[in-house]
Amino acid sequence: MSGYLITIGLETHVQLKTRTKMFCGCSLAFGTESNTNVCPVCLGYPGALPVMNREAVKLTVMSGLMLGCEINRVSTFDRKNYFYPDMSKDYQISQQAKPLCLGGGVTIQMPEGQKRIRINHIHLEEDAAKINHSARFSGVDFNRCGTPLMEIVSEPGLSSPEEAMAYLQSLKQILVYAGVSDCNLEEGNMRSDVNISVRPEGQEALGTKVEIKNMNTFKGIYAALEYEIARQLGAVSHGGVIVQETRRWEAELGETQPMRTKENAHDYRYFPEPDLVPIVLSAEQVEAWRALLPELPSMRRVRMMAEYGIPEYDAGVLADAKENADFFEAAARLCGQGQGKTVSNWFMTEIMRLLSETGKTITQCALTPEALAELVALVNGRAINGPTAKELLPELFNNGGMPGVLVHARGLGQVSDAGTLEAFVEQAIRENPKSVEDYKAGKKAAAGFLVGQVMKLSHGKAAPQQVGKLVTEKLAERV
């Protein structure tokens, strides 16, 4: 609706890739029986003291560095007080006064160009328990309670559902690249609270904010944003008033519904956590963690284009998933200079097809960069032809091994002996007189048909280039 501005901000909770919880040694194994990965600390027993997880601090700092944040050399924990069954000690350990990371941002690519979405801060906190509802009762599973989370709070700089999707997808890609989180949406490793407001054009002050809590699918976030924007615009355009509140997304109904009147920070009665000392980081420690960071996906895309001579589209697709880019680069380096485009062609066509058909990732299949490099070398050296290589690839993908071994064991080597090939060509011409007549009549495609017949006679082993040359020569003798 013209005449109004939409403002969106996101608070994204990301589960960090640690083996144990934030303030105790309990396992973070997913899918275990309810209330088995628990101890007095994460159950909130009186007198149980928290011990900070150093790995969680490291991963949060690495995330901040990847996102261009300023690292707070001294940060502190605070208690966020609230009463709800998912937090048995009645407070959550979080960071409010001095978070670990400040500023930074994510660059998104939109049809109209690039846009920088600024980040306000990143802080560490513990996750709450999970409440499971049934028809007869509600139960609380404390396995999740105490899971290390970092909350990435954007500035209210997004103006459409499309921008929100681009921001979240870019954020996920960067965090997965850095190895700080799996960002597995199905397991709840990446969840967002969405804040939306609308205001008339020309009005400086933001409109009344509505928050949609705990969204864990990109599809759901997009749909919730579309609905909530339409709801708010419909209300204000008819003289209605937007109430500051928290709402939830009901996917089955396709609408947001009220949960509670929105709390402000003072409602949580934040105060310093007395059982944890401040996090003090030296400059040397921050730089040591910076040295562990990989390239940003955007930088890797540009470098791969220059280093391997692959098209921008190929580089973009490969760089989108770190494991795909890692595999491609390993295979391209093994193949040697000038083979980047060949390796890219194999990955973008045959390998991507197999990944799509099986639903696997490149790390879940049995194909190795060494096997792909050897397959390319066998084709380049004319030990086998392209069709034979394509027949071998699914077996290498599913069962592993090296193509050279399979070629030797099955007698799949390419036939390049001139006498043998000439005999195949003569047989194909003899058995297909109509194709010869078509060629004489000017139908050059007939030569291609005869090449196919030779390949069939040789069970795909004939060297295609030599066959093509021989067929042309033999047909020329008959014109």
Task: Name the predicted role of every residue range.
Residues 362-373, 386-456:
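Strongly charged, low-complexity linkers/loops
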Residues 279-280, 315, 327-330, 339-342, ...:
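Extended hydrophobic-aromatic, low-complexity segments
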Residues 1-295, 306, 312, 334-338, ...:
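Basic, nucleic-acid-interacting segments
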